Amino acid sequence: MSEKHIILIVDDDLDDREIIRDAFMSNHKNHREYIFIENGDLLLQYLEEADNENSPALIMLDLNMPGKDGREALREIKESERFRHIPTVVFTTSSSQKDMQVSYDLGANCFITKPDTFNKLVEITNSIVQLWLPDKN
């Protein structure tokens, strides 16, 4: 198993990816590696090519992206024997009940609407870390 937890941040918006990473890093700098991925196609390619050392501990996934969107990628991840165990958090600007229900139906572990302040984002990422990424000793 990897020395660090790998967190895949899948979002087509570079600014959003960096903000999410910064929120995680605000209180959880140790034992985390952040890998930015731009869309669902590249996410699935990463997962297929990853060995045990590079397997992610968590996927943060936007829904609306060019190419294979988050819904399609989530469906493929959760249908895969190899990847379905990876906690997947849908993290999107959508606050639609339909998007939330579809995400859960596809196997998302959590659905979060992107907050409007950095402090709220830090609170959310702290909760995610406590739930799915315990400190490694």
Residue map of PLM features:
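Active-site residues of response regulator receiver
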Residues: 61-62, 92
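Conserved acidic segment of CheY-like receiver
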Residues: 4-24, 59
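Conserved active-site segment of CheY-like receiver
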Residues: 12, 91-95, 115
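C-terminal output helix
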Residues: 42, 116-127
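Acidic, metal-coordinating helix/loop segments flanking the phosphotransfer/catalytic sites
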Residues: 36-58, 122
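Receiver (REC) domain active-site loop signature in two-component systems and cognate sites
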Residues: 65
